[in-house]
Amino acid sequence: MTVLIHVLGSDIPHHNRTVLRFFNDALAATSEHAREFMVVGKDDGLSDSCPALSVQFFPGKKSLAEAVIAKAKANRQQRFFFHGQFNPTLWLALLSGGIKPSQFYWHIWGADLYELSSGLRYKLFYPLRRLAQKRVGCVFATRGDLSFFAKTHPKVRGELLYFPTRMDASLNTMANDRQREGKMTILVGNSGDRSNEHIAALRAVHQQFGDTVKVVVPMGYPPHNEAYIEEVRQAGLELFSEENLQVLSEKLEFDAYLTLLRQCDLGYFIFARQQGIGTLCLLIQAGIPCVLNRENPFWQDMTEQHLPVLFTTDDLNEDIVREAQRQLASVDKNTIAFFSPNYLQGWQRALAIAAGEVA
């Protein structure tokens, strides 16, 4: 049997590194279909830190796409697992027959599914991408994204799968000891990416709570974002006093980020699609409820796991937030499907499906 090849077709360092380390640490030892990778980006020590994997790096999307298409044409038994699919050339190859449906397995990350960009280039490309998506052999995604995808592509097979968020299961009970009182601290957004709509989110928080809460905005990732960070900071200072606004421009190491999250009382995410599951998981683990846009279908996954969900359209106040905290504290976090290590079973099944080992 031909070994499955995994494709990280865009240079998204943080997510690509997370996926590679997860496969190296949790999957490669038990499955030959978890070892071969084609990745856009620089090695930057990844080969050394992931010795169980065979990783081929490419300087750009185009060179990787050409290599994938060549492999697909040379051997029609070769199957590919695409982790987030932001590479236009690969969609066009699937649409034109360069890659066959039986070769194309796609784990939806979020931004690769939704059509939120308004630029002319995107508007021209989205219809072609939609046509190509009808030809995918199988999609893997959150419950909410599967539901969203099925509305337009009901005949494509869908399987539940969660991004392998880096988590320490021993911290699942850490929130139970925390006493929450006094001025609330609200986390706004999961990164410095514009998709977080930081300014609109800050205005929404101010409309709900006024200048009575402390707002923390993590913007250390992606890099080279200084102009936008300053734009957000200035907009925030028009709404909140300086002592109540903390805009973080430096990238935090994982432990420092965890410490930051534990100091919060609420996460506020205004984006109208699924994104930031890693941050949501870490907040929920710490007993911190989240406010979501109703257009973000991840609320379906949360309610399926009996987790409280607040919406941006709700009338929020401190009593409602504290009640959500109490509800979250009563949940056995060791049973949550999208937490580590529970998502591991889904990955083992996904590998078997993509490799053709199970129907």
Swiss-Prot record:
Q: What is its EC number?
A: 2.4.1.325
Q: GO annotations under biological process?
A: enterobacterial common antigen biosynthetic process; fucosylation
Taken from the UniProt entry, a GO cellular component term is: plasma membrane
**Localization (cell):** Cell inner membrane
Q: Which reactions appear under catalytic activity for this entry?
A: beta-D-ManNAcA-(1->4)-alpha-D-GlcNAc-di-trans,octa-cis-undecaprenyl diphosphate + dTDP-4-acetamido-4,6-dideoxy-alpha-D-galactose = alpha-D-FucNAc4-(1->4)-beta-D-ManNAcA-(1->4)-D-GlcNAc-undecaprenyl diphosphate + dTDP + H(+)
Q: Its topology with respect to the membrane?
A: Peripheral membrane protein
Spell out the molecular function terms from Gene Ontology.
4-acetamido-4,6-dideoxy-D-galactose transferase activity; fucosyltransferase activity
Q: Which Pfam families match?
A: Glyco_transf_56
Arranged from A to Z, the UniProt key words for this protein are: Cell inner membrane, Cell membrane, Glycosyltransferase, Membrane, Transferase
Glycosyltransferase among keywords: yes
* Top-rank lineage group of the source organism: Bacteria
* Pathway the protein takes part in: Bacterial outer membrane biogenesis; enterobacterial common antigen biosynthesis
Q: What does this protein do?
A: Catalyzes the synthesis of Und-PP-GlcNAc-ManNAcA-Fuc4NAc (Lipid III), the third lipid-linked intermediate involved in ECA synthesis.
Q: Which family does it belong to?
A: Belongs to the glycosyltransferase 56 family.
Q: What is this protein called in UniProt?
A: TDP-N-acetylfucosamine:lipid II N-acetylfucosaminyltransferase
State the organism of origin: Escherichia coli O157:H7 (strain EC4115 / EHEC)
Q: What gene, per UniProt, encodes this protein?
A: wecF
